[in-house]
């Protein structure tokens, strides 16, 4: 058990070093000019360690985006995470959380890899609604919402966050109040009631 925990810690540390090295290099070099040797030298890891964890530079950036989403989900885990993801407080919390990764987002933008942020938001939307049955059309509505969040967030970051974060959250909330997934909490409550009734049969 201790060996397994130690191995995971070692792997996570290696991945963290690689990610940090890539971000540092993205500040000073063109993304396409960054080599695997550049990354491993800056990170202080071997090429073997690199290829044990990643297939490419894009893989590093996407893996980091997934980590961000997973950590965010873990912080908000519970009924409210799944039922209230379109409330003002949740939107504001999400913006503040992403704001912490401004440097990462700007690096993605500079490298023409900003779509990785959209990829992360799409994953997030599907995750928070996983307990609700969705048709294909409803999934497209979620993609529409994540696309809107992506555009607003990216432009806000590019504008050096001149508008107060509460103003941005209010704008987003104002537009999602009438979104059909705004009734997600009701859908989940009905589903739970039906499950309870079924158990009594």
PLM feature spans:
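Hydrophobic alpha-helical connector segments
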Residues: 77-104
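Short, basic, alpha-helical segments at the C-terminal edge of helix-turn-helix-like DNA-binding modules
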Residues: 35-36, 65-73, 79
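Helix-turn-helix
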Residues: 25-59
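Basic, amphipathic alpha-helical hairpins
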Residues: 23-31, 75-78, 101-105, 130-133, ...
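Basic, helix-initiating cap at the start of DNA-binding domains
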Residues: 1-25, 42
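Hydrophobic alpha-helical segments that form the core
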Residues: 139-179
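Amphipathic alpha-helical packing segments from all-alpha helical-bundle domains
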Residues: 89, 110-147, 181
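N-terminal intrinsically disordered/low-complexity leader segments
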Residues: 1-11, 185-201
């Amino acid at each position: 058990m201790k060996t397994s925990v130690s191995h995971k810690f070692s792997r996570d540390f290696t991945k963290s070093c690689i990610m940090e090295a890539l971000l540092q290099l993205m500040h000073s070099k063109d993304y396409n000019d960054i080599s695997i040797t550049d990354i491993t030298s800056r990170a202080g890891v071997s090429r073997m360690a690199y290829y044990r964890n990643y297939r490419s530079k894009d893989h590093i950036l996407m893996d980091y985006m997934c980590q961000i989403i997973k950590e965010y989900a873990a912080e908000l885990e519970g009924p409210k995470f799944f039922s209230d993801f379109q409330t003002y407080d949740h939107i504001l919390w999400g913006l503040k959380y992403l704001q912490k990764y401004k440097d990462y987002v700007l690096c993605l933008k500079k490298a023409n890899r900003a779509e990785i942020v959209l990829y992360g938001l799409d994953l997030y939307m599907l995750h928070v609604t996983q307990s609700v049955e969705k048709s294909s059309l409803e999934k497209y509505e979620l993609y529409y919402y994540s696309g809107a969040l992506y555009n607003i967030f990216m432009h806000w970051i590019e504008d050096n966050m001149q508008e107060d974060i509460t103003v941005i959250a209010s704008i987003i909330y104002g537009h999602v109040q009438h979104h059909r997934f705004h009734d997600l909490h009701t859908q989940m409550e009905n589903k739970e009631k039906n499950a309870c009734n079924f158990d009594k049969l």
